């Protein structure tokens, strides 16, 4: 967990590579195996990167605190009109409050960048966040 906190502090760095940052969170996660898939380009807007890294950190933390999961997956995809983050686990329903503070923070972060987030509780727990792409002239931060 300390390395997860360190990764979040490193978010101040503008050259954060989304794939590497989330891969690091996943590799440091020892509660259960996590399958990580990344299918997004290297030109992801800075605010999208920060949102997805923060949500990934909170979701992995929630798996430890609220789940008896034996496996999880974390997928980041880029579609023609949006960026998508999906995190799911196969844990039992021991979550007491689907509207907890951590989930509220995730929702706030996604909504600040014009996106949506949904939580599903069938067959484990799933988080699906989508953030629409902006016009080409909007500021982006590439991972060089």
Predicted features and spans:
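Flexible helix-coil linker/loop segments in the cytosolic histidine kinase module
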Residues: 3-17, 39
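A short, flexible helix-to-loop-to-beta junction within the catalytic ATP-binding CA
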Residues: 12, 64-72, 95, 121
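Helix-loop-beta hinge of the Bergerat
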Residues: 16-51, 56, 60, 64
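Conserved transmitter core of two-component histidine kinases
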Residues: 32-39, 84-86, 117-120
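ATP phosphate-binding glycine-rich loop and adjacent ATP-lid/helix-beta elements
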Residues: 96-128
């Amino acid at each position: 967990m300390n390395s997860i906190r360190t990764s979040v502090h490193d978010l101040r760095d503008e050259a954060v590579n989304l794939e590497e940052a989330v891969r690091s969170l996943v590799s440091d996660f020892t509660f259960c195996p996590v399958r990580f898939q990344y299918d997004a380009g290297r030109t992801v807007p800075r605010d999208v990167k920060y949102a997805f890294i923060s949500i990934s950190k909170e979701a992995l933390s929630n798996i430890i605190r609220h789940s008896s999961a034996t496996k999880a997956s974390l997928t980041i995809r880029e579609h023609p009109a949006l960026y998508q983050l999906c995190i799911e686990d196969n844990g039992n329903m021991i979550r007491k409050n689907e509207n907890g503070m951590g989930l509220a923070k995730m929702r706030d972060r996604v909504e600040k960048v014009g996106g949506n987030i949904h939580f599903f509780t069938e067959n484990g727990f799933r988080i699906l966040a989508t953030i629409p792409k902006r016009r080409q002239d909007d500021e982006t931060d590439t991972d060089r």
